[in-house]
Amino acid sequence: XXXXXXXXXXXDGHCIPALGFGTYKPIEVPKSKAMEAANLAIGVGYRHIDTAYAYQIEEEIGQAIQSNIKAGIVKREDMFITTKLWCTCFQPELVRPSLEKXXXKLQLEHVDLFIMHYPVPMKAGDNDFPLDEQGKLLLDTVDFCATWEALEKXXDAGLVKSIGVSNFNMRQLERILNKPGLKYKPVCNQVECHVYNNQSKLLDYCKSKDIVLVAFGALGTQRYKEWVDQDSPVLLNDPVLCGGAKXXXRSPALIALRYLVQRGVVPLAQSFYESEMKENLQVFEFQLSPEDMKILDGLNKNFRYLPAQFFADHPEYPFSEE
């Protein structure tokens, strides 16, 4: 099944497959299940796999990739693998070691895309969420522009093909784009994006700068208890979305993904079920009419399932503005 042939061209000449597979797993899901999911995803045709240091799953994802390469299902060059730099590793001298560690866990010579997970530097050390005695986050004063220069060096060293950011607002993107001596601009900004938060302003801005907007939470997240308010609306139960799905004889998930793809967004779809994985790949097989798109635009309420409240006191907290 050679699916997901559609790709978005990035500013540096590389291509990003237009639908990705997300690998975040809630605490209650065992790592073996996440590895099995990644294995299935590659088997049914996903070539773009998105992971991160913070998901604590890179080794399992690496095993899934390797087993598919060994079985002759894919070649390394057909795969597009993203991982992310965690916020406690923003000191420039920590960037390359972090990238090398990630590549070793993933069993890869290089990753295709390495991105800053949040624009929020935190104190380096063994703790991923370093707190003081009062339970306040320990921040780091390093400027993420200095971190960016270290990402550029890793690209020059051949450890990564493309570099980008995640959860940056427009002002923060501007700071990198206007940085003196900028060598490579971010190829993407990965943010929460779905029909309830369609990011239209940020998307227009990113398009104007030739930055691909990658969407996590494209289906309204898996509503993991540790991060998502359980009273938040269930996106895939939205009556308008479900009505549109009925009319187009597709599932609500496919309509939600197609809405993003049609706007030039690269969605990450997450699932532990093979039937859903296969179905989500059908996003390239149909189109929504301009009327349908307008109706879906009307669902936007700038709602975040993942407001990253744990960073709310940080001076770089990205979500107080667009």
Curated annotation (Swiss-Prot):
Q: Which residues form the active site?
A: Y55
Q: Which family does it belong to?
A: Belongs to the aldo/keto reductase family.
Q: What is this protein called?
A: Aldo-keto reductase family 1 member C13
The entry's keywords:
Alkaloid metabolism, NAD, NADP, Oxidoreductase
Which BP terms does GO give this entry?
alkaloid metabolic process
Q: Which residues bind substrate?
A: H117
Q: What is its EC number?
A: 1.1.1.-, 1.1.1.218
Binding residues for NAD(+): 20-24, 50, 166-167, 190, 216-224, 270-280
- The UniProt site entry described as Lowers pKa of active site Tyr is assigned to K84
Q: Which Pfam families match?
A: Aldo_ket_red
Q: Which superkingdom heads the taxonomic lineage of this protein's source?
A: Eukaryota
Question: Which InterPro entries does the UniProt record give?
Answer: AKR (IPR020471), AKR1C (IPR044482), Aldo/ket_reductase_CS (IPR018170), NADP_OxRdtase_dom (IPR023210), NADP_OxRdtase_dom_sf (IPR036812)
Native species: Mesocricetus auratus (Golden hamster)
* Regulation affecting activity: Strongly inhibited by sulfhydryl reagents and ketamine, but not by pyrazole, barbital and indomethacine.
Subunit structure, as described in the record: Monomer.
